Amino acid sequence: MIQIRQFQWADYDAVVAVWTAAGRDALPRAELQAKLTRDPELFLVAETGGEVVAVVMGTYDGRRGWILRLAVHPARRRLGIATLLVHELENRFQSLGCPRVNLLVMPDNAAGLGFWQTLGYLPFPDVLCSKPLQEATP
């Protein structure tokens, strides 16, 4: 049985393991701590048998919700876990009065785009712009 709940610091290593298994970079504790000061209720884990198997992280700026990261351990994919996590996150956005949720999908991620479209997320022709505010260290 899948249980969805809010992230706790005791989950950090398990969440990093899910991100790593899913091919994602881990967020450093300091970066995560900053995120958790804003909207900790939008950082969710899915667990089964006491094991964290998936994670979703969102944020709400008062105008729009953003789904920042979704990852499911590869051994637990295609079981509906991601859909459960997203629906719970959407419910939490709604309870905050959030009128719209956005997310970014990499252009070469056809499977990811297909997943989001099945949940009603539609592509927009927006252009993403980015500017580093600190120089990268070699």
Regions found by a protein language model. Name each.
Residues 104, 119, 127:
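Residues lining the SAM
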Residues 74, 103-112, 130, 134:
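Conserved beta-strand-loop-alpha-helix junction that forms the acyl-donor binding cleft
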Residues 136-138:
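Short, charged/polar, Gly/Pro-enriched secondary-structure boundary elements
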Residues 78-91, 118:
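Conserved acetyl-CoA-binding loop-helix of GNAT-fold acetyltransferases
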Residues 2-69, 73, 86-88, 92, ...:
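Acetyl-CoA-dependent GNAT
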Residues 111, 115-124:
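Short acidic, glycine/proline-enriched helix-loop-strand junctions
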Residues 26, 79, 110:
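Loop/helix-junction capping segments adjacent to catalytic residues or to phosphate/diphosphate-binding pockets
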